[in-house]
Every structure is written in structure tokens, then in C-alpha cells.
Amino acid sequence: MEQEQGTLPACAYAHISSVLEVSRDEIADIWPLKQGLTNESWHFITPEGEYVYRQPGVGTEDLVDRKAEAEALKLARSIGLDGTFIHEDVEQGWKLSRFLVDCRELDAHDAEQVACAMRMARTLHESGAHLARTFDFYEEGKRYEALLRELGPITVPGYDELAAKADRVAAFAHADGAPVCITHNDFFNLNILIDRSDRMHLIDWEYAG
């Protein structure tokens, strides 16, 4: 089956050329990948291999700290958790990664795969590494809530009751005083890819902290 052919954003060609040191004419086989909630991505090839170009979506500057993401990606690459990352521009948010040919997502019903994924999580949690960013699910949720309220009242049925429960749970968690460690914070099967050599890659580090 042939892939839908496409074109990259005009600025992408210069970005790719500057990092991969290829000419525009060497960038080919472009097609859009399934879009995420916050970004748009395209597959492309050069004489050196297959890659992914990611362009941040409109408004993501309010949701994602790109400097923190780049710091996390470099860490993940250095400790062997993500072999796809190549480069991110922290000012504009675009990113280049290696495309994993014939990769598959983690099968949550495969005990061996899940065990391997858990070992990856433990490697991260016990790495002793630190990131400048602190990610707190509750505080992030309250920040998103504030952004929504700038647009008007939140009318989702049951929202206020659920928010009150979150307030109570957060208070208990903070009172616990448990030590913190670096975490991925978007750890689920779509972000855990297995390549043709059965190596796992933990991708999408936008919320790590």
C-alpha cells in the first residue's frame, strides 16, 4: 500500500538541511504521520536513512516547556532509553528523530514486554539524574484549568466535584513527604516502541520532570 505523499512546512527544509547536512533535493518520500494531541509530524528520507520531523501545534507554547523537553530527551538518549532523538530547537519547538522502520507499540498484554518497559522506568527513576523542570500532575492540572477559565466557565458535568477530590488527594500526597525522582509522565504503550531488533525506545518526553 502506498503512503499518502505530502510536503513539509516551508521552514522544515532549512531546519533539516542544517542538522542533517543534506540539500533540499535529497529530502524525499514525505508523508504525514498520525497526528498527536499537541504536534504535527512527517516522515521523510535522505540518503542516510529515514527520519521524522515534528512541528509543534498552535498554542502548544502554553502547554509544553520545550527547553525542559530537550533536556529530558538528551538525558534519555544518554542513558539508552530513547535511541530515536537527534535534535530539538528549543526556541521554535521543532524536532528531528530517527524513524523506526517496522516498529511496533508495546503490547500491554505481553508480560515480557511489560517487564522490559518496567525495567526502563526503573532505570530512569534510579538514574540519579536531575532536570531543571519539576512536573507535578496536580499543579499542571490547575495550570490547564486556569488557561481554560480564561476562555470562559468550565461547564463539564461533575467537574467541580472531581476537582475537589483532586484537591484532597494532592493534599495527602504532599503531606506524605515522599522523595521525588525524575519521571517520564506520559508512560503508556503508544510511547514505547519496539524496533526490528527488539530494542525498546521510550519516546515523547514533553512532560518529563
Regions from the language model: what does each represent?
Residues W31-T46, V52-Y53, R168-G209:
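Active-site acidic catalytic loop and adjacent metal/ATP-binding pocket
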